[in-house]
UniProtKB/Swiss-Prot annotation:
Species assigned in the record: Desulfitobacterium hafniense (strain Y51)
Binding of Zn(2+), residues: H563, H567, C665, H669
Annotated cofactor note: Binds 1 zinc ion per subunit.
Protein name: Alanine--tRNA ligase
Names of required cofactors: Zn(2+)
Task of the protein: Catalyzes the attachment of alanine to tRNA(Ala) in a two-step reaction: alanine is first activated by ATP to form Ala-AMP and then transferred to the acceptor end of tRNA(Ala). Also edits incorrectly charged Ser-tRNA(Ala) and Gly-tRNA(Ala) via its editing domain.
Family according to the record: Belongs to the class-II aminoacyl-tRNA synthetase family.
GO biological process: alanyl-tRNA aminoacylation
Coiled coil: none
GO CC annotations on file: cytosol
Assigned keywords, A-Z: Aminoacyl-tRNA synthetase, ATP-binding, Cytoplasm, Ligase, Metal-binding, Nucleotide-binding, Protein biosynthesis, RNA-binding, tRNA-binding, Zinc
């Protein structure tokens, strides 16, 4: 019996013998592919080769590619084959060989290497792909009766991009695995016939409209799921019963104290925990961090689902670390990133688990209260607003809300949830400012491909004589552009730095004999072509014009200071906090720097001061700054720091600052650290779980910042009539006075409330035998309003209180029902209806609830409605 590791090696070595280069798995983060959040298939890393956007460096390749897919998340663990993370074995041809070679090689591997019986194998082809059918018969000797047509045999990795007809190999697992129906055959929905290999004949490109156009060259892309073929070769009932999963499942069983195969329900939970923890481990190992959007949200959702199912097994203590160590042991020989990034993975697992346990407990309690309320009202659907409140306020995933409600025979109103979420996104989008992205039309893309890489002169020159190779306006190529036009320009070579690695693009101008244009932004495409966006400020510019390209030297130098300071900052952070610190993002501009990094607690004042001291000591040392190109292997051997999760080419640029800092970097820098001048940290804070952010200023901007602080101190001293040296003592004295005055105000408010109580008690009305007091009171905040309610409650003993207070045009509401459950009355339900009249909402417990309203003008109207509202709720 072959192990999963042996099967992986057998596949790769077989295709190496056929002239394929064995490549390591690409990252789960697709490179330069905005159409995909995650790597979902083996061919994804090779899409630029299939599309010929980049010339393939080799004609053939074979990989075992890490993949993550989540559309079928809810059925993972309930079927034999569905997973979130899986390994896709594949062989690829980039315009080299095609069907005539791919088909017999696949047959050779399946029948001669794996030695699967021919009489158990079946083939499918597309009805319009007679060529493939004939090749199966001619090249392998497969009987025509064992080849079936399948109109679904058209494959693609996404909605747009390379695609083609495909041919699939199935294995018949035997009648014992089937449905037992007399007509059970290939195509039946049962588990008898298992697809083990998909051969994709990549011939077309599908666009946004669904139109297919032939690719420049024909390609081969095949995919064999390692987990599936392992289940076949090991005679396992499911993928989960192979050696790829059993060690993980056995650990889950050990932690839960429940044997595997104890019950179908527990088995599903164990499989979910094993599958999801494996997926999370690999996603973290590639630098994906848990977050609230994009692939970070996918990771967090999978992780939280694992924790939820572990709790169903009785595992209520942290466990993810123990499961990860099993995964690391079994997989790190082929995926060393699981070992190399162990600290990063474990830190995030611990933090996410800790945070979600608290979220789960809090959110579950709130949801249970809402379920109880629904049950009491005879309803089965939770409002989308309530579900969004759980998600937005407590981070409680709506998917988890849905699952927990399904267990209670209930559901979520997803239409109103999505509406609330969309409104939230709309508001967030309005509040954010995003840089205008380069919009590539097909014509622009083709031109970029034809021009290829744009030589960058800006490391050594800030002015260059170059030529306008092409002009585009509104996505269309034009021969000339006039004053006022905004255009995209391709230059023969460029001194302008293209936005990359967190450093913003250069500013500057180009000048010809007849025109001048101001640079707006610079970006680099996947082909290495540099896109320049200019605004024509004078004259007419033509394609073919010779121009002078001039970088804004002042802004370039200011940016370089901040970029070099960022390198020193990372080195200082690692020295003070530890080697676990890794860059998670950055922004480098002429006036500031922003550095995001991994660390799991706020920096103390002493740590922050030490980091700043080390930074400026490195500046004062005036160390030389040098850049050198070398192979990626040589850079790694030198100990150069790389951006975690980033995929680099074979040749990289390494920037050194004396013996203090060594990083892979393509940005621009000063010549010596002394050129930075001064670095001042202006803020440090958290931006997410396990992520911190430091903002700092350097050079002239640091001086400007320090002057501003000094001016504020002098202004404050003058305002408080104190010397700057006495300012702190003066402020402390004022704070004591303010605290004393606030105490006096509270005491006065309490006296006012007490004096109001007696007169308010005279307003109590009888509503079908229930004492009801609905009144407007003069409370300036919610605390005072609650105190007034408490005083009235003590006096009334039993009944209902509904108190409203107008504060700056809005309304605060408090409702009390005493004793709890009086005549079936629920304070939260009452206040919800009352507050609605004033344009607000709220809720709370059966005995006490509070709410807000937007329109104080309707306070009286709302109070008038209280008796009728209470009457409608009396049971």
């Amino acid at each position: 019996m072959y192990t999963g590791n042996q099967l992986r090696d057998m596949f790769l070595n077989f295709f190496a013998s056929k002239g394929h280069r064995i490549l390591p798995s690409a990252s789960l983060i697709p490179k330069d592919d905005p159409t995909l959040l995650l790597t979902v298939a083996g061919m994804v890393p090779f899409k630029p080769y299939f599309m010929r956007k980049v010339e393939p460096p080799f004609p053939r390749a074979t990989t075992s590619q890490k993949c993550v897919r989540t559309p079928d998340l809810e059925v993972v663990g309930k079927t034999a084959r569905h997973h979130t993370f899986f390994e896709m074995l594949g062989n690829f041809s980039f315009g080299d060989y095609f069907k005539a070679e791919a088909i017999p090689w696949a047959w050779e591997f399946v029948t001669e290497v794996l030695k699967l019986p021919i009489d158990q194998l079946w083939i499918t082809v597309h009805p319009e792909d007679e060529e493939a059918k004939n090749l199966w018969i001619e090249k392998t000797g497969v009987s025509p009766e064992r080849i079936k047509y399948d109109p679904e045999n058209l494959w693609a990795a996404g909605p747009v991009g390379p695609c083609g007809y495909c041919s699939e190999i199935y294995v018949d697992l035997g009648e014992s695995r089937g449905c037992g129906k007399p007509d059970c055959a290939l195509g039946c929905d049962c588990d008898r016939f298992l697809e083990i290999w998909n051969l994709v004949f990549m011939q077309y490109n599908r666009d946004e409209a669904g139109l297919l156009t032939p690719l420049p060259k024909q390609n081969i892309d095949t995919g064999m799921g390692l987990e599936r073929i392992a289940s076949v070769m090991q005679g396992a009932a499911s993928n989960f019963d192979t050696d790829l999963f059993l060690p993980i499942i056995n650990k889950v069983a050990e932690l839960s104290g429940i044997p595997y195969h104890d019950s179908p329900k527990n088995d599903v939970a164990m499989k979910v925990v094993a599958d999801h923890t494996r997926a999370v481990s690999f996603m973290l190992s590639d630098g994906i961090r848990p977050g609230s959007e994009g692939r970070g949200y996918v990771l967090r959702r999978i992780l939280r689902r694992a924790i939820r199912y572990a709790r169903l097994l009785g595992i209520d203590k942290p466990f993810l670390e123990q499961i990860f160590l099993i995964i690391q042991k079994d997989y790190s020989h082929h995926y060393p990133e699981l070992k190399e990034n162990e600290n990063f993975i474990l830190n995030h697992l611990r933090l996410e688990e800790k945070n979600f346990q608290a979220t789960l407990e809090q959110g579950t309690q709130i949801l249970q209260d809402k379920v109880k309320t629904l049950q009491e009202a005879g309803e089965t659907m939770l409002s989308g607003a309530d579900a969004f409140y759980l998600y937005e306020t407590y981070g409680f995933p709506v998917e988890l809300t849905e699952e927990m409600l399904i267990e209670q025979g209930m559901s979520v109103d997803m239409e109103t949830f999505n509406a609330a979420a969309e409104e939230h996104r709309r508001l967030a989008k309005e509040q954010s400012q995003q840089m205008k992205a380069v919009q590539e039309s097909a014509a622009i893309s083709e031109k970029a491909k034809a021009l290829g890489t744009t030589p960058f002169l800006g490391y050594h020159e800030l002015a260059a004589h170059t030529k306008v190779e092409a002009l585009f306006r509104d996505g269309e190529e034009v021969k000339d552009a006039a004053e006022g036009d905004e255009v995209l320009i391709f230059l023969r070579e460029s001194p302008f730095y293209a936005e990359s690695g967190g450093q913003i693009s250069d500013s500057g101008v180009i000048r010809s004999l007849r025109a001048e244009a101001k640079l707006i932004e610079v970006k680099k495409g996947v082909t290495g072509t540099v896109y320049h966006r200019f605004l024509l400020t004078q004259g007419v510019l033509h394609t073919g014009d010779e121009v002078e390209a001039l970088v804004d030297e002042h802004l370039r130098l200011a940016t370089a200071r901040h970029h070099s300071a960022t390198h020193l900052l990372q080195a200082a952070l690692r020295a003070v906090l530890g080697e676990h610190v890794q860059q998670a993002g950055s922004l480098v501009t002429p006036d500031r720097l922003r550095f995001d990094f991994t660390h799991f607690s706020a920096l103390t004042s002493a740590e922050l001061q030490r980091v700043e001291d080390l930074l400026n000591e490195a500046v004062l040392a005036n160390m030389p700054v040098a850049a050198e190109e070398m192979s990626l292997d040589a850079a790694k051997a030198s100990g150069a720091t790389a951006l975690f999760g980033e995929k680099y080419g074979d040749t990289v640029r390494v920037v050194s600052m004396g013996d203090y800092s060594l990083e892979l970097c393509g940005g621009t820098h000063i010549r010596a650290t002394g050129d930075i001048g001064l670095v001042k940290i202006i803020s440090e804070g958290g931006i997410g779980a396990g992520l911190r952010r430091i903002e700092a200023v350097a050079g002239a901007e640091a001086l400007k910042y320090m002057r501003s602080l000094n001016d504020q101190i002098l202004d404050a001293a003058q305002l408080l009539k104190a010397q700057p040296s006495d300012l702190l003592k003066r402020i402390q004295g004022l704070l004591v006075q303010v605290k004393d005055l606030e105490k006096e105000v509270q005491q006065l408010n309490a006296k006012v409330a007490k004096s109001e109580v007696e007169s308010l008690l005279q307003q109590v009305k009888d509503v079908e035998g229930v004492p009801v007091l609905a009144a407007k009171v003069s409370a300036q905040d919610m605390d005072t309003l609650r105190n007034t309610a408490d005083l009235l409650k003590d006096k009334m003993k039993d009944g209902v209180l509904v108190l409203g207070a107008a504060v700056e045009g809005k309304v605060n509401w408090v409702t009390v029902v005493t004793p709890v459950g009086l005549r079936g009355l629920h304070a939260g339900q009452i206040i919800k209806e009352v507050a609605k009249i004033t344009g607000g909402g709220g809720g709370g417990r059966p005995d006490m609830a509070q709410a807000g309203g937007k329109d104080a003008a309707k306070l009286g109207e709302a109070l008038d409605q209280v008796p009728a509202i209470i009457k409608s709720h009396i049971k």
